Amino acid sequence: FRVLKPGGKFLASVPAEFPEKICWMLSKEYQNQPGGHLRIFKKKLLIKDIEDKGFIFDASERFHSIHSAYWWLRCLFWKSQDSNFLVSWYKKFLELHILKKPKWIDFIDRLLNPVLGKSISFYFTKK
């Protein structure tokens, strides 16, 4: 934040609290993965922490809602996730979305993002 000029834009993106809490409740292994998510951020506290560093909060939005269910399945079947039918099927569904971008899946993703979005992005302006 020290190199950003006043009026500059800053984006912070973190795992969204609700979907991440579900993952942590379903699997201790998930939360202990090397390089994994180290903590769960609360939206209001993260905004306040960044504002305290000299930024103005502009907006936030959530993304990747259809990924939440995939991670919940992986956490639920952690030990057998590589061979589990549901995890495998849902992974194919996500690959379809990523590679082909069917409009109906985009619609579902956008519809569910406000509640189930796996990631949340925060937009700020430097004072």
PLM segments and residue spans:
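Positions that flank functional sites
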Residues: 19, 65-66
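A short glycine-rich, Lys/Arg-flanked "PGG" loop and its adjoining helix->strand segment in the class I
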Residues: 1-9
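A structural motif corresponding to the C-terminal end of an alpha-helix
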Residues: 49-55, 126
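Alpha/beta-hydrolase-fold catalytic nucleophile elbow
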Residues: 13-14, 63
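A conserved catalytic-core signature of glycosyltransferases
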Residues: 36, 41, 117-119
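A C-terminal cap/extension of S-adenosyl-L-methionine-dependent methyltransferases
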Residues: 25, 67-127
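Conserved S-adenosyl-L-methionine
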Residues: 55-65
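Short, glycine-/aromatic-enriched active-site segment of Class I SAM-dependent methyltransferases
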Residues: 15-39, 47-49
